[in-house]
Amino acid sequence: MKVIFMKADLNLIKTLHPLEIKVIVNNEEEDDISASIIIEKLGFNEGQANKTIEWLNSKGIIEEIYRKLNVFYKATERGLGALRDGFVEEKIINLVSQKAVLASNLALELDIDVKEVRKAFGNLLKEGILSLDLDKQIIINCLDGTETNYQKVRVLLERAKNSDLLRESLTTEELLLISNFAKKKGADSVFFKIIEKLDLKFRLSSFGLEVKNFLMKSKLTGDELTKLTPEILKNKTYENKKFRAYNIHIPSAKTFIGRANSYLDYISKIKDKLVGLGFQEFDGPLVETEFFNNDALFMPQFHPSRDIKDVYYISDPSMQESLPEPYFSNVKLAHETGYATGSRGWRYSFSEDLSKRLVLRTHGTVLSAKQLINAKNPSRYFGVIRCFRYDQVDATHGVDFYQTEGIVIEDGVSIKTLLGLLEIFAKELAGATEIKYVPAYFPFTEPSIEIHVKHPVLGWFELGGSGIFRPEVTKPLGIDLPVIAWGIGIDRMALMHLGLNDLRDLFTYDIGDVILRRGKIDAKVRNL
């Protein structure tokens, strides 16, 4: 019978991959086709076998005849470690059989993680192998020779050490037991990992048989050359060989080129806006002394925000050798007596060692304090600064974040000037339509103001803090003019401006999600 193909079919046949051709011409109508069979029969590796089956199935050359999901239990490193080093249950029994042990001292005696010991000890109590007397001392009960659960798990691990355990090969009792020690995800913490493998079998379809006849008549074997290289030309290995046909009408693969990150682009636009308003940019190191991070800002050394629970301290080196004079002495006096400000200060004994400690900067105002030393009159400065705080991560908080920090040093600046700048941040840069100013307290500003904005999903939240620097901040650093200052969370501004509901979306690794919202975000950033 003469086989007649449509033009589209001929194009498909001519562009078959050599691996596909090998599978087609080496299988008969009744032959089963699967990845394992191809590997054994044709010498493909696993990747080649799976990919070839996927190609052939998508083209209708083979058709599925069998499908089954097999579940296996694979011994994890933790399980093999228990097999090698002993189960915690075994170690508990060995210890208790040698000496009297209180339940509360068990983890300490074994030098094993408390959670692991509690779990193993609980299992032994549940099985009745151990019990407690009135003094909470552990007692080993008489065993009747019955195999314990951990001994049964040991047997299963011994079997799984050589080959994965197929669920169907396990008894009902073994399945119930192994389910307590197995996970599909996060299996590092258990003895077995659950692995699912789909067993698929195919056969040549009617179309596939026609394709095979065409290939056989065309004397195509899958050994055809796929590319023309200098070596082939030089050695003339192309002689008596056929080349694989190429379909020039097939669209080329999509190229994903690098593009500007929308969030970094947003930060760049903020910088452009502030420079356009006459500000100069400043920057500084991530690691700062407590002196500039807190002391120079008139934050007392007993302030709760300086606690180790809120700050990342540097362990090596832990302290800076010296601090700049006369500013250190001036700040010390400001804390102890108020310096020349009319204030009485905080009235405590100021510690130089504490002031020298190194920390990851917790706020951008640290750079404003450093800038005051060299500031001109009048002047405007800003920075886009990465800050670090020990915080609980949620939709509006992160352990590291960007702030835009700034100061204006000028005769005549006032709260009115500050409110105008804050409105620019909230409305023009963050895109907020509803804002409010809330009285606040910061040790380094008086008066102090927080600006809050209303998010359509998250509701009201703080965008940042601001105020006029206290004389106890400015005078010890050589400034006798009023200074307005602010620290605004750029991450939160971006949350508003880019239409997101969670700070973590700014740093997502989900490329699909980024691509879906890129057009909308890029348009908003361009319109800043």
From Swiss-Prot:
One of its GO terms (molecular function) is magnesium ion binding. It is an enzyme of class 6 (ligase). Binds 2 magnesium ions per tetramer. The gene is pheS. Its main location: cytoplasm. Keywords: Aminoacyl-tRNA synthetase, ATP-binding, Cytoplasm, Ligase, Magnesium, Metal-binding, Nucleotide-binding, Protein biosynthesis. One of its GO terms (biological process) is phenylalanyl-tRNA aminoacylation. Mg(2+) binds at E446. Belongs to the class-II aminoacyl-tRNA synthetase family. Phe-tRNA synthetase alpha subunit type 2 subfamily. It catalyses: tRNA(Phe) + L-phenylalanine + ATP = L-phenylalanyl-tRNA(Phe) + AMP + diphosphate + H(+). Its cofactor is Mg(2+). Tetramer of two alpha and two beta subunits. L-phenylalanine binds at T365, F444, F469. One of its GO terms (cellular component) is cytoplasm. It is found in: Cytoplasm. InterPro entries: aa-tRNA-synth_II, aa-tRNA-synth_II/BPL/LPL, Phe-tRNA-synth_IIc_asu, Phe_tRNA_ligase_alpha_bac/arc, Phenylalanyl-tRNA_Synthase. Pfam families: tRNA-synt_2d (PF01409). CDD domains: PheRS_alpha_core. It comes from the Bacteria. It comes from Borreliella burgdorferi (strain ATCC 35210 / DSM 4680 / CIP 102532 / B31). Its EC number is 6.1.1.20. This is Phenylalanine--tRNA ligase alpha subunit.
